[in-house]
Amino acid sequence: DHGGARIILVDPEFAGVIAEALTLMEGPKPFVIDVDDAAFSGGKRIGAIEYEAAVAAGDPAFAERPPADEWNAIALSYTSGTTGNPKGVVTHHRGAYLNAVSNILAGNLGQHPVYLWTLPMFHCNGWCFPWTLAALAGTNVCLRRVEAAAMTQAMDRHGVTHLCGAP
Protein backbone atom coordinates (compact mmCIF):
# COMPACT_ATOMS: atom_id res chain seq x y z
CA ASP A 1 0.00 0.00 0.00
CA HIS A 2 2.61 2.55 1.03
CA GLY A 3 4.64 2.23 -2.21
CA GLY A 4 1.88 3.77 -4.32
CA ALA A 5 2.33 1.30 -7.20
CA ARG A 6 0.09 2.11 -10.16
CA ILE A 7 0.86 -0.99 -12.23
CA ILE A 8 1.80 -4.51 -11.17
CA LEU A 9 2.99 -7.32 -13.45
CA VAL A 10 1.86 -10.70 -12.13
CA ASP A 11 3.66 -14.01 -12.61
CA PRO A 12 1.00 -16.76 -12.70
CA GLU A 13 2.88 -18.73 -10.04
CA PHE A 14 2.18 -15.94 -7.56
CA ALA A 15 -1.30 -14.89 -8.74
CA GLY A 16 -3.01 -16.27 -5.62
CA VAL A 17 -0.72 -14.39 -3.25
CA ILE A 18 -1.07 -11.17 -5.25
CA ALA A 19 -4.87 -11.50 -5.44
CA GLU A 20 -5.00 -11.86 -1.65
CA ALA A 21 -2.65 -8.91 -1.14
CA LEU A 22 -4.82 -6.72 -3.38
CA THR A 23 -7.83 -7.39 -1.15
CA LEU A 24 -5.85 -6.06 1.83
CA MET A 25 -5.00 -2.75 0.17
CA GLU A 26 -6.71 0.30 1.58
CA GLY A 27 -5.73 2.78 -1.13
CA PRO A 28 -6.32 2.70 -4.87
CA LYS A 29 -5.60 -0.67 -6.45
CA PRO A 30 -2.87 -0.85 -9.11
CA PHE A 31 -3.65 -1.82 -12.70
CA VAL A 32 -2.85 -5.54 -12.91
CA ILE A 33 -1.15 -7.04 -15.97
CA ASP A 34 -0.77 -10.82 -16.27
CA VAL A 35 2.46 -12.25 -17.68
CA ASP A 36 2.07 -15.58 -19.48
CA ASP A 37 4.95 -18.01 -19.03
CA ALA A 38 5.20 -21.22 -21.04
CA ALA A 39 7.59 -22.60 -18.40
CA PHE A 40 4.84 -22.57 -15.76
CA SER A 41 1.50 -24.33 -15.90
CA GLY A 42 -1.09 -23.36 -13.37
CA GLY A 43 -2.07 -20.20 -11.64
CA LYS A 44 -4.90 -18.02 -12.78
CA ARG A 45 -5.32 -14.72 -14.50
CA ILE A 46 -6.19 -11.89 -12.17
CA GLY A 47 -5.32 -8.94 -14.38
CA ALA A 48 -7.19 -6.70 -16.73
CA ILE A 49 -4.92 -7.59 -19.67
CA GLU A 50 -2.02 -9.88 -20.61
CA TYR A 51 1.45 -8.31 -20.99
CA GLU A 52 1.95 -8.93 -24.74
CA ALA A 53 -1.54 -7.56 -25.46
CA ALA A 54 -0.74 -4.48 -23.37
CA VAL A 55 2.45 -3.90 -25.35
CA ALA A 56 0.63 -4.41 -28.66
CA ALA A 57 -2.02 -1.89 -27.59
CA GLY A 58 0.62 0.77 -26.95
CA ASP A 59 0.73 4.05 -28.84
CA PRO A 60 3.61 4.00 -31.37
CA ALA A 61 3.51 7.82 -31.46
CA PHE A 62 3.99 8.13 -27.70
CA ALA A 63 6.47 10.91 -27.00
CA GLU A 64 9.22 10.06 -24.53
CA ARG A 65 9.12 12.20 -21.41
CA PRO A 66 12.36 12.38 -19.47
CA PRO A 67 12.02 12.73 -15.71
CA ALA A 68 11.52 16.26 -14.42
CA ASP A 69 14.26 15.63 -11.87
CA GLU A 70 17.06 13.04 -12.05
CA TRP A 71 16.57 12.40 -8.34
CA ASN A 72 12.99 11.14 -8.92
CA ALA A 73 12.39 7.45 -8.26
CA ILE A 74 12.67 5.01 -11.15
CA ALA A 75 12.15 1.80 -9.15
CA LEU A 76 10.97 0.57 -5.77
CA SER A 77 12.21 -2.87 -4.79
CA TYR A 78 11.49 -4.88 -1.66
CA THR A 79 14.13 -7.08 -0.08
CA SER A 80 13.27 -10.47 1.37
CA GLY A 81 14.90 -9.62 4.67
CA THR A 82 17.95 -11.89 4.30
CA THR A 83 20.02 -9.78 6.71
CA GLY A 84 17.18 -8.33 8.78
CA ASN A 85 13.61 -7.19 8.39
CA PRO A 86 12.27 -6.81 4.83
CA LYS A 87 12.55 -3.25 3.57
CA GLY A 88 11.69 -1.12 0.56
CA VAL A 89 14.57 0.36 -1.42
CA VAL A 90 14.10 3.32 -3.78
CA THR A 91 16.38 3.72 -6.80
CA HIS A 92 16.42 7.13 -8.49
CA HIS A 93 17.13 7.88 -12.16
CA ARG A 94 20.55 9.38 -11.44
CA GLY A 95 21.67 6.41 -9.34
CA ALA A 96 20.39 3.86 -11.88
CA TYR A 97 22.20 5.68 -14.70
CA LEU A 98 25.49 6.01 -12.82
CA ASN A 99 25.36 2.41 -11.62
CA ALA A 100 24.57 1.14 -15.14
CA VAL A 101 27.50 3.09 -16.61
CA SER A 102 29.75 1.75 -13.85
CA ASN A 103 28.60 -1.82 -14.61
CA ILE A 104 29.36 -1.31 -18.31
CA LEU A 105 32.83 0.10 -17.68
CA ALA A 106 33.94 -2.11 -14.79
CA GLY A 107 32.33 -5.27 -16.14
CA ASN A 108 33.74 -4.84 -19.65
CA LEU A 109 30.42 -6.16 -20.96
CA GLY A 110 30.72 -5.14 -24.60
CA GLN A 111 27.75 -4.78 -26.93
CA HIS A 112 24.78 -7.14 -26.76
CA PRO A 113 25.70 -9.27 -23.74
CA VAL A 114 23.56 -12.33 -22.97
CA TYR A 115 22.87 -12.09 -19.25
CA LEU A 116 21.64 -14.97 -17.08
CA TRP A 117 19.53 -13.72 -14.18
CA THR A 118 20.82 -15.55 -11.13
CA LEU A 119 20.91 -12.37 -9.04
CA PRO A 120 17.43 -11.43 -7.78
CA MET A 121 16.12 -8.19 -9.28
CA PHE A 122 14.92 -7.13 -5.84
CA HIS A 123 18.52 -7.38 -4.59
CA CYS A 124 19.64 -3.74 -4.90
CA ASN A 125 17.50 -3.52 -8.06
CA GLY A 126 19.57 -6.37 -9.50
CA TRP A 127 22.67 -4.19 -8.98
CA CYS A 128 21.03 -2.02 -11.67
CA PHE A 129 21.67 -4.67 -14.32
CA PRO A 130 18.17 -4.19 -15.80
CA TRP A 131 19.30 -0.69 -16.84
CA THR A 132 22.80 -1.87 -17.80
CA LEU A 133 21.40 -4.47 -20.20
CA ALA A 134 18.92 -2.01 -21.69
CA ALA A 135 21.77 0.42 -22.41
CA LEU A 136 23.74 -2.31 -24.21
CA ALA A 137 20.78 -3.88 -26.06
CA GLY A 138 21.50 -7.04 -24.09
CA THR A 139 19.49 -10.24 -23.86
CA ASN A 140 17.90 -11.19 -20.53
CA VAL A 141 17.75 -14.92 -19.80
CA CYS A 142 15.44 -15.61 -16.86
CA LEU A 143 14.98 -18.77 -14.81
CA ARG A 144 11.96 -19.85 -12.81
CA ARG A 145 14.38 -21.03 -10.10
CA VAL A 146 18.13 -20.73 -9.65
CA GLU A 147 19.17 -24.37 -9.90
CA ALA A 148 22.44 -25.73 -11.28
CA ALA A 149 20.87 -27.88 -14.02
CA ALA A 150 18.64 -25.05 -15.24
CA MET A 151 21.59 -22.64 -15.22
CA THR A 152 23.85 -24.87 -17.32
CA GLN A 153 21.02 -25.64 -19.75
CA ALA A 154 20.32 -21.90 -20.15
CA MET A 155 24.03 -21.17 -20.65
CA ASP A 156 24.27 -23.77 -23.42
CA ARG A 157 20.96 -22.89 -25.07
CA HIS A 158 21.33 -19.10 -25.07
CA GLY A 159 25.09 -18.60 -25.21
CA VAL A 160 25.20 -16.76 -21.90
CA THR A 161 28.13 -14.35 -21.65
CA HIS A 162 27.55 -12.88 -18.18
CA LEU A 163 25.84 -13.44 -14.84
CA CYS A 164 26.08 -12.14 -11.29
CA GLY A 165 25.55 -13.97 -8.05
CA ALA A 166 24.67 -13.17 -4.47
CA PRO A 167 24.56 -15.45 -1.44
Regions found by a protein language model. Give the residues of each.
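Conserved pre-ATP/AMP-binding loop-to-beta segment of ANL
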Residues: 34, 48, 56-78, 85, ...
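Conserved S/T- and glycine-rich ATP-binding loop of Class I adenylate-forming
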Residues: 8, 73, 79-82, 115, ...
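Adenylate-forming
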Residues: 8-20, 37-38, 119, 144-149, ...
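Conserved AMP-binding A3 loop
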Residues: 74-99
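Conserved AMP-binding/adenylation subdomain of ANL enzymes
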Residues: 97-114, 122-162
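Structural detector for helix-capping/boundary residues
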Residues: 6, 12, 49-53, 71, ...
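Structural core segment of the AMP-binding/adenylate-forming
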Residues: 1-56
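Short hydrophobic/charged patches on amphipathic alpha-helices used for structural packing
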Residues: 1, 65, 149-152
